[in-house]
Design a protein with these regions (language model features):
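Conserved, structured core segments of small domains
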Residues: 1-102
């Protein structure tokens, strides 16, 4: 079966910085597991001001690899930032990886 890549554009709710920081360890743990499995291409937060961490975040972007969209949806159901109301929504789009090769 060919694995599929997806871009996740995650938007934060306003006023969730403290909660985001509190829940971050669980979020990072799940991303580390994906990375250990070789299914995480890239992940990171989008700061409102890169020079001021207290300004908060617009959200996060991830590129992940799953066997099916359904498998990704199941994984997302357990995403701590979604479950705890940090993300207002996650936009999922298929992605055709061209570079880097391999």
């Amino acid at each position: 079966m060919t694995c599929l890549f997806f871009v996740l554009s995650c938007t934060d709710n306003e006023g969730t910085l403290e909660k985001r920081l509190a829940v971050r360890p669980q979020h990072i743990e799940r991303l580390q597991k994906l990375d250990d499995e070789g299914r995480l291409v890239v992940a990171g937060a989008m700061p409102k001001d890169p020079n001021d961490p207290q300004a908060g975040f617009y959200g996060s972007t991830m590129i992940v690899e799953f066997d099916t969209r359904e498998a990704l949806d199941e994984w997302l159901k357990e995403e701590p930032f979604l479950k705890e109301g940090i993300y207002s929504h996650v936009d999922v789009k298929p992605f055709n990886k061209a570079f880097p090769k391999g």
